[in-house]
A protein has these predicted regions:
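Catalytic domains of riboflavin
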Residues: 1-223
Length: 223
């Protein structure tokens, strides 16, 4: 449990954590940070050191209260009017799960939405919505964001790890264990030398170099 304790402390202190799912799934390592602590410099680190897609994961309960749907469900609805879409919709990914993608958003005060400061603003504002979801979060969401945007929202499975073992659920479980606002930024770590995902061994080297906790999915499942 030491690795989990270190990861929880890092998240509470506004630092990064690395999460490896498993060799039997994506076999990828994601860079993870609590949305409430995100700053523009953190976005820069994620896009340069990790290099994958910067996404914001939120729990299924909050997504439901915001009337957010999974992207494949939205596309299914749209395909009634655009039949060609039905052939493109991916309900099951190659690694065996339904994708957790929902819509993309920008905060209304952003310009293009893609800059480090714009993305950090969008993420922090969405974290604020999640923190007051039972007060005026739903109203704030519709007033303060526009879509499409540059932050990809991910919706966690309703039963979290009982239902799905992706980085979305793993990071949400860890953020819940840390008693932080239930919104977490995740980004896949890529390898520019191999053009593939960064191996666990290389992620471990990075972890030690920058003193960032690296945890396995099995450790999170045992919380």
């Amino acid at each position: 449990m030491l690795a989990i304790q270190e990861a929880v402390k890092a998240l509470r202190d506004g630092k990064f954590v690395l999460i490896h799912d498993s060799e039997s799934r994506e076999n990828e390592v994601d860079m993870v940070k609590a949305a409430q602590h995100i700053r523009s410099s953190n976005i820069a680190t994620m896009r340069t050191d990790a290099g994958g897609l910067i996404c914001l994961a939120i729990p299924h309960e909050i997504a439901s209260k915001l009337n957010l749907m999974f992207m494949h469900d939205l596309l299914h609805s749209a395909s009634k009017n655009i039949p060609s879409l039905s052939k493109m919709i991916s309900s099951i990914a190659p690694y065996g799960d339904r994708p957790s993608f929902s819509i993309t958003i920008n905060h209304i005060d952003t310009f293009t939405g893609i800059t480090d400061k714009d993305r950090a603003l969008t993420i922090r504002a969405m974290s604020d919505v999640c923190s007051k979801i039972d007060m005026d979060g739903e109203l704030e969401f519709s007033k303060k964001f526009r879509s499409p945007g540059h932050i990809h929202l991910l919706i966690g499975a309703k039963e979290l790890l009982k239902e799905r073992s992706g980085h979305t659920e793993l990071s949400l479980r860890l953020i819940k264990h840390a008693n932080l606002i239930p919104a977490v930024v995740i980004c896949e770590m890529l390898d520019s030398e191999t053009s593939g995902a960064l191996s666990v061994d290389k992620a471990s080297v990075y972890s030690k170099k920058f003193n960032i906790p690296l945890v396995e999915s099995s450790q999170i499942k045992n919380i």
